[in-house]
């Protein structure tokens, strides 16, 4: 027999298979649809604690067993009384009585009773209709705004249907009548109403005995009674009535007292409440430091307990979570915080009054009403957020997040035993064995240093020494996120190679694969930084290891060597620091007679030199130790001062000393440790976030004469940081912050110096070739790529880059599309100096500049002296240790006008940021705050055409931004439709036929799905961006220089955005430009903060005017000397012609010594000419034979007269006059230059112009 025949053994009839029930029957047959499950459920619920002591919580979270359907019919009657309290002003008393023995429940309230009258349309008493007829209600008017709980016409009738007895008693005082009616047998049987006269006050009382059999119960158990009693306390809080339970008044009748029932004042819980900001919203947040409670939402809507929350909770919680997240991100920037991580630490109370609320089901556990239609809006206050922050929850959230993330770091732990293999790792033979702790891992700065170490291993062997190269600098782990640390390949490699376990406290080193780390890095500031980063890594995660002296070591390789002699008499002196070399030079005739070789990188050494270094390993090994005892830092850091150097050439290190200007934002030059353990303090000072101001003071203490003694082989971490690592921080600032006088950072100055020396005004040169020339000539040590980027940046001229580019961009040097990131490779680019540079940097000034020296070579000046402050012409930005700077450029014409005002003792006029070819506007907000506003035109009602963006907003980025807005807007609009549809579906989950049958929706069949869909929809809608949802589409017609975006909005949305003031900010059509971080090195080499453009200009003019005087004095002296030389040359030639000086006698030339003796006898003076070091007669002896003529005499006399006239003209001019003349010459050249630049720009802008838009009705740069 088939399965089919078996299943149809007793087939149902058609009538049995297809049934029709009326609504009354359906409610009893399908309780889940109306009141929820009628079976017992065991779960945690908030209930009243009958056994609570005076200081104990009265409402507790406890596991109970109850029947949801029974709870719901009870709740319907409770909400019915609450609704009456809202409707009727005279309803101010509600009494709830529960007899646990009989199971009888009654709810009484005063106030207006129900109309005791017969309904004319339906011919039935009104109380009978309301409580005994299904789908009857006073809440069907959709045009009326109601803030009650009832709405669907079921309400207390559900309690009637699920009761064995249900009575309604009400008094209509207006008619002087009292109504009483009794229902039994699940509302199937009803007695005739009893109407009597009654002269006292109105009231309504509902009494019922649930049908316990239908709920599988015999009576009201303790759990259910505790749950019902808690609900009465809810009623006391959510209404303004006096509420009684079993004749005892509940005094905890306000929001604060109600929350106190859960979390009394004596508990450890931290409570923050806002019940006054908005009359329709009461909000509380509880932080549980004991971490015993899970995240909870205890919420109410119009006295209904929304146990699953809803959109009202999401609106409140979302704001609070966002506020806390902002605070947390500020405090711990690198910790990844998700909203759920914040919520899990908090309990939220929300009591909201919502107009015409919508719920997902008849059980009304979850509000689905759209937030926009609440009838009110709760906005969390800053005070409230601060109150929550004060509870300490943010620290807990950060700690939890770090604990989670750090747990992931354990996945990258190393092991003390066994092999570890990495591509570039050369393990010690004993590593990972029982003798592993005796091994040393040599961490090298790159592959070249690895080769140096491998050469050295030929000397010391491989048994106890392993080598692993680092790729650049190690990550600063102290403030990095655990995820970033876990993803860092080098951090992971070191952990596995050494055998380090995350968080382990090491009592000894025997469990490690390597018992020490040796750092092999270049002897320069970047090498110091690498050492510090490795120390920081170990100290941050394994502070116990740095307490072992020598766990971290470094190899002191030579920075330079002085060599003298050859063979057996050869002498070699090695130096590991520039300071020790300078000290040696002082004692050894400035190094004369010695050959000096500089080792800027370990790759400079050949294998023999590497082996030589390792042969004397112990003498070159520096071991670091922990020094907790406090030192007198003040006397140590300020023990020496640097003498001023007035010579034209000075050592670079001298320029760095004490460079923080007394007028800067932080002026202290004494750093005092914040931690009693000075080594601990030094570590966090150098690497930890939050100590930026301390680092500024620390940098200010720098003294180049306070350096590590190279003879010491034991150095404390404290001394390393304060004497060696500090030089990296100082150098970092020097590289990042430009000089007031020329607007150059060191790399820019080197490029300009090399370009002038190469004289590339006429002949263009490849950028890659110029990079090599500049690097070699100026001793640049930070890589060709960095220098090439500097050259490219100096030649860029797109909007937002240079206002006046000194180098010409001959090739694709980058555009406004990406902010210059789209430049071609340096090997494809050519450049040359713009002729206008000659009018800015005057040749006469080059001889008075103070040059630096390095490797015993003269390099670029400390700063140049342009005739206008190029820092204001082109602006600058940079970030260094402790200091950053951001200076926006100005119009050169405004700058020149103000210089001339200052030269005549007038006050300069206020300048504002200016960018060449920017067509948008720069507007002053207040003080030092400006904004850059885009230029756009409004076309019709729903379209704007953007023709320029705020400066610094690049075209590609803006296009991506608009693409993202379109995607967001499409999603938001779809979600809103989906939400609207979901709400509509929730309202119509039951469709009633004439016979009363109903059909459930898909979500009704799957309540979990309904709950999930509602939550996801409302969450997304709550985050909607009004600008994104307003945009319909956009198009663009941009090029590398042209901006052209046309944005079309949905009808009416553009006008709304303009009126609300959200258009410009929402579309990023404005960008702030603040003049609040203008740091510069001044003429003394000290960093100074300037508050205004005027302050920069005044400082520049003061110094530049002195330099004009210095130049004048120098030229007068130089020209007088040149006149003297011309005069004595004339006299010499005349003496030769006259025979007073005899060069030839008897057909033979006289000896040079005889001629020089004759010059001395005739009192001819000696002069220093050209590159000569001492005065001599070179100016005479260099005269050629054919210049000993009368024609040459006349020529020299003419030169002498011209020079005399030139000198007289210069003597007659003041420095101010000289400057003004040069400014005028510059303006004349600048006019020509600017005209050509503008013509070229406009030609490119208008060439092959794209499609034209409609004519605008209104053009504006919107405010």
From Swiss-Prot:
Domain Topo IIA-type catalytic: 737-1223
Residue positions binding Mg(2+) 2: 522, 524
Biased composition (Low complexity): 981-1000
Top-level lineage group: Viruses
Marked site (Transition state stabilizer) residue numbers: 827
Residues engaged in binding ATP: 80, 109, 137-139, 150-157, 362-364
Site (Interaction with DNA) residue list: 473, 476, 695-696, 745, 780, 786, 954
Keywords: ATP-binding, DNA-binding, Isomerase, Magnesium, Metal-binding, Nucleotide-binding, Topoisomerase
GO MF entries: ATP binding; DNA binding; DNA topoisomerase type II (double strand cut, ATP-hydrolyzing) activity; metal ion binding
Start-end of Basic residues biased regions: 1247-1263
Cofactor: record remark: Binds two Mg(2+) per subunit. The magnesium ions form salt bridges with both the protein and the DNA. Can also accept other divalent metal cations, such as Mn(2+) or Ca(2+).
Enzyme Commission number: 5.6.2.2
InterPro entries from the UniProt entry: DNA_Topoisomerase_II (IPR050634), HATPase_C_sf (IPR036890), Ribosomal_Su5_D2-typ_SF (IPR020568), Ribsml_uS5_D2-typ_fold_subgr (IPR014721), Topo_IIA (IPR001241), Topo_IIA-like_dom_sf (IPR013760), Topo_IIA_A/C_ab (IPR013758), Topo_IIA_A_a_sf (IPR013757)
Classification via Pfam families: DNA_gyraseB (PF00204), DNA_topoisoIV (PF00521), HATPase_c (PF02518), Toprim (PF01751), TOPRIM_C (PF16898)
Record: residues binding Mg(2+) 1: 445, 522
Cofactor: Mg(2+); Mn(2+); Ca(2+)
The Toprim domain, residue ranges: 439-553
Family label: Belongs to the type II topoisomerase family.
Official protein name in the record: DNA topoisomerase 2
Protein encoded by which gene: TOP2
């Amino acid at each position: 027999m088939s399965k089919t025949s078996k299943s149809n053994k007793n087939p149902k009839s058609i009538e049995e298979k297809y049934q029709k029930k009326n609504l009354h029957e359906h409610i009893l047959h399908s309780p889940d649809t109306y009141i929820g499950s009628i079976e017992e459920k065991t779960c945690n619920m908030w209930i009243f604690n009958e056994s609570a002591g005076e200081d104990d919580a009265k409402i507790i979270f406890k596991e109970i067993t109850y029947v949801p359907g029974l709870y719901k019919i009870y709740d319907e009657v409770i909400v019915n009384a609450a609704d009456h309290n809202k409707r009727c002003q005279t309803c101010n008393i509600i009494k709830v009585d529960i007899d646990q023995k009989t199971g009888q429940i009654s709810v009484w309230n005063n106030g207006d009773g129900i109309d005791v009258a017969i309904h004319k349309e339906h011919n039935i008493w009104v109380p009978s209709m309301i409580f005994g007829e299904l789908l009857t209600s006073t809440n069907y008017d959709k045009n009326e705004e109601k803030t009650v709980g009832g709405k669907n016409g079921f309400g207390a009738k559900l309690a009637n249907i699920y009761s064995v007895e249900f009575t309604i008693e009400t008094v209509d005082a207006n008619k002087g009548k009292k109504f009483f009616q009794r229902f039994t047998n699940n509302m199937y049987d009803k007695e005739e109403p009893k109407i009597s006269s009654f002269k006292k006050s109105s009231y309504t009382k509902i009494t019922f005995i649930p049908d316990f059999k239908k709920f599988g119960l015999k009576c009201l158990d303790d759990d259910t009674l505790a749950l019902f009693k808690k609900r009465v306390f809810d009623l006391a809080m959510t209404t303004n009535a006096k509420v009684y339970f079993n004749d005892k008044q509940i005094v905890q009748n306000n929001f604060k007292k109600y929350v106190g029932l859960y979390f009394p004042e004596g508990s450890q819980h931290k409570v923050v409440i806002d019940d006054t900001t908005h009359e329709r919203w009461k909000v509380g947040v509880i932080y549980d430091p004991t971490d015993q409670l899970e995240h909870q939402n205890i919420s109410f809507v119009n006295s209904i307990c929304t146990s699953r929350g809803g959109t009202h909770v999401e609106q409140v919680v979302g704001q609070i979570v966002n506020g806390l997240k902002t605070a947390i991100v500020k405090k711990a920037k690198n910790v990844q915080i998700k909203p759920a991580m914040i919520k899990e630490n908090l309990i939220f109370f929300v009591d909201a009054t919502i107009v015409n609320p919508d719920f997902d089901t008849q059980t009304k556990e979850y509000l689905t009403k759209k937030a926009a239609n609440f009838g009110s809006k709760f906005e969390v206050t800053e005070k409230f957020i601060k109150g929550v922050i004060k509870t300490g929850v943010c620290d807990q959230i950060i700690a939890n997040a770090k604990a989670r993330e750090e747990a992931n770091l354990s996945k990258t732990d190393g092991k003390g035993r066994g092999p570890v293999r990495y591509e570039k790792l050369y393990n010690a033979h004993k590593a990972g064995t029982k003798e592993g702790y005796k091994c040393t891992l040599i961490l090298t700065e790159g592959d070249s240093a690895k080769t140096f170490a491998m050469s050295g291993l030929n000397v010391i062997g491989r048994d106890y020494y392993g080598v692993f190269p680092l790729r650049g600098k190690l990550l600063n782990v102290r403030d990095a996120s655990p995820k970033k640390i876990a993803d860092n390949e080098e951090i992971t490699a070191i952990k596995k190679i050494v055998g380090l376990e995350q968080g382990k406290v090491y009592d000894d080193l025997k469990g490690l694969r390597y018992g020490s780390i040796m750092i092999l890095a270049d002897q320069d500031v970047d090498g110091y930084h690498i050492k510090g980063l490795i120390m920081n890594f170990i100290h941050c995660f394994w502070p116990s290891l740095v307490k072992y002296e020598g766990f971290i070591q470094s190899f002191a390789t030579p920075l330079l060597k002085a060599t003298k002699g050859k063979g057996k008499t050869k002498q070699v002196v090695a130096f590991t620091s520039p300071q020790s070399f300078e000290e040696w030079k002082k004692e050894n005739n400035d190094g004369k007679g010695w050959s000096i070789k500089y080792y800027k990188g370990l790759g400079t050494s050949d294998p023999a030199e590497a082996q030589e270094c390792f042969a004397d390993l112990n003498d070159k090994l520096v071991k670091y130790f922990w020094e907790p005892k406090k030192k007198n830092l003040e006397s140590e850091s300020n023990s020496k001062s640097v003498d001023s150097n007035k010579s034209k050439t000075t050592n670079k290190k001298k320029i760095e000393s004490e460079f923080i200007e007394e007028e800067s934002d932080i002026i202290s030059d004494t750093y005092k440790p914040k931690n009693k353990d000075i080594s601990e303090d030094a570590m966090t000072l150098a690497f930890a976030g939050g100590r930026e101001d301390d680092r500024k003071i620390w940098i200010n203490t720098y003294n180049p004469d306070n350096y590590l003694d190279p003879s010491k082989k034991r150095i404390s971490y404290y001394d390393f940081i304060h004497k060696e690592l500090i030089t990296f921080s100082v150098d970092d600032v020097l590289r990042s912050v430009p000089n007031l006088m020329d607007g150059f950072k060191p790399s820019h100055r080197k490029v300009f110096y090399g370009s002038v020396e190469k004289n590339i005004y006429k002949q263009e040169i490849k950028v890659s070739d110029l990079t090599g020339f500049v690097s070699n000539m100026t001793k640049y040590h930070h890589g060709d790529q960095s220098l090439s980027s500097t050259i490219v940046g100096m030649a860029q001229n797109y909007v937002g880059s240079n206002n006046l580019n000194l180098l010409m961009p001959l090739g694709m040097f980058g555009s406004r599309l990406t902010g210059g990131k789209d430049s071609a490779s340096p090997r494809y680019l050519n450049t040359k100096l713009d002729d206008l540079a000659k009018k800015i940097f005057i040749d006469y000034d080059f001889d008075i500049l103070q040059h630096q020296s390095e490797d015993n070579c003269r390099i670029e000046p400390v700063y140049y002296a342009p005739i206008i402050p190029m820092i204001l012409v082109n602006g600058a930005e940079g970030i260094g240790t402790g200091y950053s700077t951001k200076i926006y450029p100005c119009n050169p014409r405004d700058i020149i006008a103000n210089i001339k005002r200052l030269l005549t003792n007038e006050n300069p006029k206020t300048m504002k940021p200016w960018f060449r070819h920017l067509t948008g506007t720069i507007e002053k907000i207040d003080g030092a705050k400006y904004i850059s506003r885009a230029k756009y035109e409004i076309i019709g009602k729903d379209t704007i055409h953007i023709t320029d963006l705020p400066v610094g907003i690049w075209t590609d980025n803006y296009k991506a931004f608009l693409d993202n807005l379109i995607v967001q807007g499409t999603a938001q609009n779809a979600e809103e439709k989906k939400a609207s549809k979901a709400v509509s579906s929730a309202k119509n989950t039951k469709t009633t036929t004439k016979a009363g049958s109903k059909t459930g929706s898909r979500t009704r069949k799957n309540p979990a799905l309904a709950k999930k869909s509602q939550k996801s929809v409302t969450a997304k809608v709550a985050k909607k961006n009004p600008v994104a949802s307003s945009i319909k589409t956009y198009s663009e017609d941009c090029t590398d220089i042209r901006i052209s975006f046309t944005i079309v909005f949905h009808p009416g949305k553009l006008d709304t955005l303009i009126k609300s003031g959200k258009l410009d900010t929402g579309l990023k059509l404005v960008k702030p430009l603040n003049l609040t971080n203008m740091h510069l090195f001044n003429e003394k080499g000290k960093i100074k903060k300037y508050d205004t453009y005027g302050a920069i200009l005044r400082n520049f003019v003061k110094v530049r005017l002195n330099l004009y005087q210095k130049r004048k004095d120098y030229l007068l002296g130089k020209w007088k000397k040149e006149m003297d030389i011309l005069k004595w040359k004339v006299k010499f030639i005349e003496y030769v012609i006259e025979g007073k000086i005899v060069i030839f006698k008897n057909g033979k030339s006289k000896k040079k010594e005889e001629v020089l003796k004759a010059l001395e006898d005739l009192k001819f003076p000696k002069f220093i000419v050209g590159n000569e070091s001492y005065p001599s007669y070179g100016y005479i002896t260099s005269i050629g034979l054919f210049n000993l003529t009368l024609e040459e005499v006349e020529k020299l006399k003419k030169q002498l007269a011209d020079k005399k006239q030139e000198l007289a003209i210069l003597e007659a001019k003041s420095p101010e006059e000289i400057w003004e003349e040069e400014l005028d010459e510059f303006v004349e050249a600048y006019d020509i230059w600017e005209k050509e630049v503008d013509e070229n720009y406009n030609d490119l802008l208008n060439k092959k112009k794209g499609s034209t838009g409609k004519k605008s009705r209104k053009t504006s740069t919107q405010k």
